[in-house]
Amino acid sequence: IYPAEVEATLLEHPAVKDVAVVGVPDEEWGESVKAVVQLEGTAHASDALALELVDYCRRHIAHFKCPRTVDFIEQLPRDDNGKLYRRRLQGAW
């Protein structure tokens, strides 16, 4: 699974301002896909929105590529050049 494909799909959703997709430990599969989403200003984090984002992915890409979980964050950790600190996100889970 390429994170960029899942991220590009989620970025098309109007509630998503920025997103990072990371692999996290999973007892059943060894690792599963998690999306960490920074919302647009008018969107509000909720369980319903998390389910909507997973469903949105399933309508646009193969189910096995879609995140199993979605977490919301105020600001994704990026350096001055805009590069994502992906390991910081993975370490949080």
PLM region spans:
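AMP-binding/adenylate-forming catalytic core of the ANL superfamily
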Residues: 1-65, 74-75, 80-84, 88-92
